[in-house]
Amino acid sequence: MHCGRRVALCSALVFSFAAIPPVFAQQTVEVVIQKYRFEPAEVQIRAGDTVKWINQEKRTSHSVLFAPEQGGESERFFPGESWQRKFDAPGRYVYSCGPHPEMKGVVEVVAP
């Protein structure tokens, strides 16, 4: 193969890979429930990511309550337990704790 052809072939390969959009690994973001608070209270994730709520209270159960059109309420989960949800659609998901409505949080889902 001539040197000029090799350079052209290598250049074509490099530029063809550059045109492929990056693929992001799906991630899980953790929200700790402690002292009757979601921590952090607001998280931002990409569509396809998961949020995992972990109950680190000593004695009480909690749930994660979204508006009905955004998924409704999780089962109650007790100290040491967790609940998780995958978010596929971009948007702002405001939630609270079913039994403790003063506990509030937000999941902001952006396009990948």
Predicted feature descriptions by range:
Residues 2-4, 10, 14-112:
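Extracytoplasmic copper-binding redox domains, predominantly the cupredoxin/blue-copper superfamily
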